[in-house]
Amino acid sequence: MILNGILDPRLFPQYSGKSHVVEWRQELKRALLIRRKFKSDWSGESVELDCEMHEGIITRGMLRGVMWQWMIFHEYNCFLLKHSEHQPNPPSKEWCIQRSFELYGEENVRNWWYSLPFKSIPFRL
């Protein structure tokens, strides 16, 4: 299990690429549960028995068919939520950006965002 360092799939060659997304998401979720003390990012309630991981700043749907989609599964973009907080309406992109800024620092999150290989950046942070 990966517990040290930044949880960025680009830093772990064994998880790089689309073919390893499922394994990487499982590792990322396990590590985030420990780091965030099994608490929901939205409510602070326990997610020990009821946890979903939400990509909040940029989603899979926004990058459908893009070869580098796997790069969005980064700790800065993933949020732990109870099922009832995730469905039917997950937290807004704006809330996720603010939460990530609080957890990791605005400069770090911006550096990650602008390092993604967009043809054109969909929005500014």
Where are these regions (language model features)?
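A boundary/linker detector
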Residues: M1-K37, G44-D50, W95-L125
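Histidine-centered nuclease catalytic patch
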Residues: W42-L80, N89, K93-W95
